[in-house]
Amino acid sequence: MIRIFLTGYMGAGKTTLGKALARELHIPFIDLDWYIEERFHKTVGELFSERGEASFRELEKNMLHEVGEFEDVVISTGGGAPCFFDNMEYMNRVGTTVFLDVDPKVLFSRLRVAKQQRPILQGKKDDELLDFIVQALEKRAPFYRQANYIYCADKLEDRSQIETSVQQLRKLLNLHIAS
């Protein structure tokens, strides 16, 4: 049974690598944010705004526990999910966790072009964006680093790099993957 949780900051490549890894392993991929949006028929941003952070994080935890019961699956979490309640401990208990570690400057270059799709980043100037990323990573790193594995996901700029990363992840997780 395979149950892999990909964690990391927004823009780390959780969805990109998760889809590619799941395809390689011939198992389903679940993006926790998409799962929540599908269930509640609202975007994560709308749910966050309407319910407030505490209520949203409780909902997120419940949905994490729901998908955490699925077998033979790759799951990407929201960037904040590992940092609340006992979510990291839970994921480590029921599956294999991988923290996609990305240099803040690489995250900056990825998020800079995707600012409009991420409400929390809209309106931030370049220097503010980099500071925001660095500060958020400092707060979240202690949670992310509780993952079973840490994988440097700096190089995901084209199909070849994604494929290389998938093969490296397969090797890294070899003890847990028998496909």
Curated annotation (Swiss-Prot):
UniProt cofactor(s): Mg(2+)
Primary localization class, coarse: cytoplasm
Catalytic activity line of the entry: shikimate + ATP = 3-phosphoshikimate + ADP + H(+)
This enzyme's EC code(s): 2.7.1.71
UniProt cofactor note: Binds 1 Mg(2+) ion per subunit.
InterPro entries: P-loop_NTPase (IPR027417), Shikimate/glucono_kinase (IPR031322), Shikimate_kinase/TSH1 (IPR000623)
Pfam families, alphabetized: SKI
Origin superkingdom: Bacteria
Keywords: Amino-acid biosynthesis, Aromatic amino acid biosynthesis, ATP-binding, Cytoplasm, Kinase, Magnesium, Metal-binding, Nucleotide-binding, Transferase
Residues noted as binding ATP in the record, renumbered to the chain: G11, A12, G13, K14, T15, T16, R118
Localization: Cytoplasm
Enzyme category, top tier: transferase
GO function term, MF aspect, one: shikimate kinase activity
Gene Ontology biological process: amino acid biosynthetic process; aromatic amino acid family biosynthetic process; chorismate biosynthetic process
Gene Ontology CC: cytosol
Binding site for Mg(2+): T15
Subunit structure as annotated in this protein's UniProt entry: Monomer.
HAMAP family: Shikimate_kinase (MF_00109)
NCBIfam families with a match to the protein in the record: PRK13949.1
Family per record: Belongs to the shikimate kinase family.
UniProt-recorded name of the protein: Shikimate kinase
Species of origin: Bacteroides fragilis (strain ATCC 25285 / DSM 2151 / CCUG 4856 / JCM 11019 / LMG 10263 / NCTC 9343 / Onslow / VPI 2553 / EN-2)
Originating gene: aroK
